[in-house]
Amino acid sequence: DDGGALHAPGSVIQKENNKNDKKILELMSNIIQLLTGEVAIRTHHVSIYFSLDEWDYITGNKDLYEEGMKEEPQQLHPLAACEYKDESNVAAHTEATLCCNNDGNFTEMSPVEQPPPANGIKEEVASWEGGNQSDCSINKCTEQIQGTDTPTPIMGYRMNNSLLENYISNAIKEETASCEEINQSNCSINPLTEQIQGTDTPTPIMGYSLFRIPCNKSDESADTSPHKSRITKKTLHKKNSCVVSHKITPIGEKPVSTSGCGKYFMKSSELSVHPRTHTGEKPFPCSECGKCFINQSTLARHYRTHTGEKPYPCSECGKCFASSTYLRDHRRIHTGEKLSSCSECGKYFLNCWSLARHHRTHTGEKPYSCSECGKSFAISSDLAGHRRRTH
C-alpha cells in the first residue's frame, strides 16, 4: 500500500480535458454567432432560427418555452442551401457545419462533440479594409488533432462584405491581415501550412503565404511586386508602389558581373557604368569647362570646383569639403588613423592615391604624357598645368 503516494488518476485528467474542450466549443459558438447574428435550435426534424435579440428574450423567459428550447442543442445537419468548398466525406463527430440561407447570408453553425483537440489551437482570421470590395472568399481551413494523422475540417464558408469583430481569449489567438488594395473586386486568401504539435502532416491555415518573386519595379505594372526575398509574413504592396527602391540580392545568389574583366557588382547601375572604364566613354560633359565624366555623380562633384560649393563640413574643426571622400580623409587627421604607408621610406598617407603618387618619386614613373610635345609627368595636375601654360 503506497499510502500517500502521489498519482494522477485518469478520470481527473479526462475531466480537465473535457472542461477545456467545452470552453473551446463555447468560444467557437460565440464567434459563429458574431458572424451569423443568429442562434439555431433543432427539435426532431424542424430547424428554428432566432436572432440574437430573440434569443436573449427567450433565454430570459425560458420558463415559458421549456418545450421548444434545449439547453445544449444537438448537431444540425446541413440544409439544402448549404455551400461547401470541399465535399469530401468526413466523420460526423469531427465536423463543424455552417449553413446559409438562400440569400447567401449565414444562418447557423452548430458546435459538435469531438475528440480532445490539440492544446493552443491557433485560428488565423483575415479581415479586409479595401474599398469597393464585392466578394472575398476564404479557403477551407483545417486543423490537425494531436496524435492523429487525418486533418479535420473546421469551417468552410463564404463571406459577403462582412467583417469579423476582434475576439481575444486565452484559448484562441486571432491575427488579422488587412488587404489595402483600392477598388479591389475580388480578394482571395491562399492557405499556408502549419505543423501542429504531435503530427507529421502540414495543415493549411488561412492568412499567410510563402513565395519568392523577383522585384520588377515598374510604374506601368498593375500587379503588386513583392521583392526578391523570402517572405515569412503575408506582405501586400499597394498597386503601382514599391516599398524598397533597390533590389535585394537573395542569399546564395551571386551579384551581377561583367563579361570582360569578371569584376562583380551588387547593383545593376554600377554594372552599366563599369564598361566605360574599359572603353573610355565619358558621356557627361561639364557645361563650364567642357571636361567629360563617366557618370553624373562624378560630374556633380567636379561642378563644385566651379561653384565653390562645399556641402560637407567637418564636425570637429568646421572645415568644409566639396566631396564626402575628402571629408572622410580629413577626419583621419583628428582620429590619428593612418592606413597607408610607403614600403620604401615608411611615410604615412591618408589615402591610397596619395600613396601611389608618392611612390612614383621612388620609381621615377611618369604615366601622364602631353599629346602635343610628348613630355611626361608623374602627377596629372602637373600635366594639366603644363598644357595651360605651354599649349
UniProtKB/Swiss-Prot annotation:
Q: Where can this protein be found?
A: Nucleus
Family annotation (InterPro entries): Znf_C2H2_sf, Znf_C2H2_type
The cross-references to SUPFAM superfamilies, in alphabetical order and at most eight, read: beta-beta-alpha zinc fingers
**Gene3D superfamilies given in the database record:** Classic Zinc Finger (3.30.160.60)
Q: Where are the zinc fingers (C2H2-type)?
A: 284-306, 312-334, 340-362, 368-391
Which controlled-vocabulary keywords does the entry list?
A: DNA-binding, Metal-binding, Nucleus, Repeat, Transcription, Transcription regulation, Zinc, Zinc-finger
Keyword field contains Disulfide bond = no
Q: Which PROSITE patterns match?
A: ZINC_FINGER_C2H2_1, ZINC_FINGER_C2H2_2
Q: GO CC annotation: what is one?
A: nucleus
* GO BP field: regulation of transcription by RNA polymerase II
Q: Which GO terms describe its molecular function?
A: DNA-binding transcription factor activity, RNA polymerase II-specific; RNA polymerase II cis-regulatory region sequence-specific DNA binding; zinc ion binding
Its function, per the record, reads: May be involved in transcriptional regulation.
| Family according to the record | Belongs to the krueppel C2H2-type zinc-finger protein family.
- By what name is this protein known? Oocyte zinc finger protein XlCOF7.2
- What is the scientific name of the source organism? Xenopus laevis
